[in-house]
């Protein structure tokens, strides 16, 4: 049985988070992505940094985490992007069925008509 998973990635701009979200859904690596504005405080290069970031949460399955990680690592503007995942322990049957209908374990983008 597929394990539902939520992948979290932070971005410096809303635009970069939206671009990645669209690509993850287009590639069928995620059923849906949500973007929220957040304030992050972290230690980076010997300094404490406080800045506005945009958190992308991708709804997917654990089997697709590696594909998402590879995509993000290859396209992200940060030197060390946050790419974390958490298993969803509870979700409605209908939501899981919908998620399953939206993703593709091969990670291949669907053929689209022009």
Curated annotation (Swiss-Prot):
Coiled-coil stretches noted in the UniProt entry, renumbered to this chain: none
Gene3D superfamilies linked to this entry: 3.30.70.120
Molecular function per GO: copper ion binding
Entry's Gene Ontology BP terms: response to metal ion
Pfam families given in the database record: CutA1
Subunit field text: Homotrimer.
Family to which the UniProt record says this protein belongs: Belongs to the CutA family.
Protein name: Probable divalent-cation tolerance protein cutA homolog
Annotated organism of origin: Encephalitozoon cuniculi (strain GB-M1)
The organism's taxonomic lineage, starting at the top: Eukaryota, Fungi, Fungi incertae sedis, Microsporidia, Unikaryonidae
